[in-house]
Regions:
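Proteins enriched for Cys/Gly/acidic motifs involved in redox and nucleic-acid/cofactor modification
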Residues: 1-170
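Active-site/ligand-binding neighborhood in enzyme catalytic cores
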Residues: 173
Length: 182
């Protein structure tokens, strides 16, 4: 992930001139919450609002057309966040649903456990689920990168690692390995 070297991060929205909303769209409630949050920001702030996450694929284009957000970018574009947030013109860049994240996270500020994404997407096509359409097919993160991330985090004092993904049980099916081998 980007180092955010061009931005100063704050948790106080009143101080922010840029707000990035990492949205979820798994449930109707999550979508509603995102739209409600954007409305709250519109009332109380003049900050530029950017939408990323799963909602970029389901609601992003409409929110951009309504001028409720300045920019929309998908999961695969988060690695370019510095350049995206610096754009003056509104944009819609949903990204690539086949992208495999190559970023390595060195730290989790304020956390005692480290979360390691090992897998993304899902090959199941459950009739009630939107995940394959907003996250793409199942794909595994590179084993070397996963182990590198764990090593870096261990050097930063973490001793507990939680392996995460959309469907962790499918880890390795696309790369001819398995969770047990990892």
């Amino acid at each position: 992930m980007s180092s955010m070297k061009d931005f100063e991060i704050t948790e106080n929205e009143e101080e922010a001139d840029t707000i990035v909303i990492n949205s979820c769209t798994v449930t109707n409630g999550a979508d509603t919450h995102v739209r409600s949050y954007i409305s709250q920001i519109e009332k109380n702030s003049s900050a530029k609002v950017f939408l990323t996450g799963c909602g970029a694929h389901t609601k992003g284009e409409k929110l951009l057309e309504e001028k409720r957000v300045h920019g929309v970018f998908g999961q695969s574009e988060k690695e370019n966040i510095d350049a995206l947030l610096a754009q003056d013109q509104p944009f819609y860049n949903p990204g690539d649903l086949n992208h495999v994240d190559t970023s390595v996270v060195d730290d989790f500020i304020g956390k005692s456990r480290a979360f390691i994404k090992i897998q993304e997407g899902c090959n199941f096509r459950c009739s009630y689920c939107i995940i394959p359409f907003v996250r793409g097919d199942a794909r595994s993160m590179d084993e070397t990168r996963i182990l590198e991330q764990i090593s870096r985090l261990a050097l930063n004092g973490f001793g507990e690692f939680i392996l995460t993904g959309t469907n962790v049980g499918s880890y390795g099916q696309d790369t001819k390995t398995s969770l047990a081998k990892l």
